[in-house]
């Protein structure tokens, strides 16, 4: 497994590649951040299930991807990294972006943990805009 500085971008790329190849599941390195993002993706219905395998530095999250219909169209149409190590993006609760008019979600890292833009707006808190999922 290659060592990467941006685990979130790595996770999003792995999910994007797996959905385009119509894979049943995808393994991503387990970190506190990727666990939280996997939890949000599961709560929002973008992945059907996720579990952790292995332990310590070799721990991996296995996400079961969702498809719809006979043509097995992916539920996840796009993933976009917003804030990155070279250019952080922060928003207060009034500036939080709406993804595709509310169809997609923005995943925000707040002082209350990682949550969707909808939850952050409801709680009246802003934070770092990690990525868009639609």
Curated annotation (Swiss-Prot):
GO terms for cellular component: ribonucleoprotein complex; ribosome. Keywords: Ribonucleoprotein, Ribosomal protein, RNA-binding, rRNA-binding. GO terms for molecular function: rRNA binding; structural constituent of ribosome. Gene3D superfamilies: 3.30.1370.30, 3.30.1490.10. Transmembrane segments: none annotated. SUPFAM superfamilies: Ribosomal protein S8 (SSF56047). GO terms for biological process: translation. InterPro entries: Ribosomal_uS8, Ribosomal_uS8_CS, Ribosomal_uS8_sf. Pfam families: Ribosomal_S8. It comes from the Bacteria. The keyword RNA-binding applies. PANTHER family: 40S RIBOSOMAL PROTEIN S15A (PTHR11758). Part of the 30S ribosomal subunit. Contacts proteins S5 and S12. Belongs to the universal ribosomal protein uS8 family. One of the primary rRNA binding proteins, it binds directly to 16S rRNA central domain where it helps coordinate assembly of the platform of the 30S subunit. NCBIfam families: PRK00136.1. This is Small ribosomal subunit protein uS8. The lineage of its organism: Bacteria, Bacillati, Cyanobacteriota, Cyanophyceae, Synechococcales. The gene is rpsH.
């Amino acid at each position: 497994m290659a060592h990467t500085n941006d685990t979130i971008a790595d996770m999003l790329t792995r999910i994007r590649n797996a959905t385009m190849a119509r894979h049943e599941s995808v393994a991503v390195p387990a970190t506190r951040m990727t666990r939280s993002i996997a939890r949000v993706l599961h709560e929002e219905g973008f992945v059907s299930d996720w579990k952790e395998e292995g332990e310590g530095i070799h721990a991996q999250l296995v996400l079961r991807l969702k498809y719809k219909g006979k043509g097995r169209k992916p539920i996840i149409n796009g993933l976009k990294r917003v804030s990155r190590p070279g250019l952080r993006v922060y928003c207060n609760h009034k500036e939080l972006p709406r993804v595709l008019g509310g169809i997609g979600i923005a995943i925000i890292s707040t002082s209350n943990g990682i949550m969707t833009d909808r939850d952050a707006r409801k709680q009246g808190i802003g934070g770092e805009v990690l990525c868009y999922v639609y």
